[in-house]
């Protein structure tokens, strides 16, 4: 995670990468990153860095851009995958309407939520806004089942 402080300091995307270095849905991630950069008023360079990464196991690759640091490509293994997790819910952080929903540089609320979840003996903090599950501290909630199961 970035140490930048404001939402307009950085734009990023995180994608699944397999053991062959192939990025899942690479073009879609780059399109979303361009859209988010525009919403955040971050001017991206014309060319993107190579998304080819050398990995020995399936994991995540994070592509980020900041004016101060330029492009960065980071790989990390999955910390949890296909297993049952315990969660707490916390109020979702809010910014201005253009910033809400963007992958940006203000990580403080996410870090604080992760620490809060760990102190409660949980694996993840789920962000709720107006009675809806909108995000999580370290992954994107994909589905909320009727029985309360959240798929991240």
Task: List each language-model region with its residue ranges.
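Conserved alpha/beta cores of soluble small-molecule-handling proteins
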Residues: 1-132
């Amino acid at each position: 995670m970035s140490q930048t402080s404001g939402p307009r300091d950085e734009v990023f995307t995180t994608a699944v990468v397999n053991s062959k270095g192939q990025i899942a849905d690479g073009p879609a991630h780059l399109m979303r990153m361009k859209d988010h950069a525009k919403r955040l008023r971050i001017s991206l360079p014309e060319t993107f860095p190579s998304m080819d990464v050398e990995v020995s196991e399936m994991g995540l690759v994070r592509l980020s851009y900041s004016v101060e640091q330029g492009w960065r490509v980071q790989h990390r293994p999955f910390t949890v995958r296909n297993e049952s997790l315990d969660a707490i819910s916390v109020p979702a952080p809010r910014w201005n309407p253009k910033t809400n929903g963007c992958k940006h540089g203000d990580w403080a609320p996410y870090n604080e939520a992760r620490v809060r979840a760990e102190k409660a003996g949980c694996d993840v903090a789920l962000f709720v806004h107006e009675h809806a599950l909108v995000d999580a501290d370290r992954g994107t909630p994909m589905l909320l089942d009727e029985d309360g199961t959240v798929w991240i």
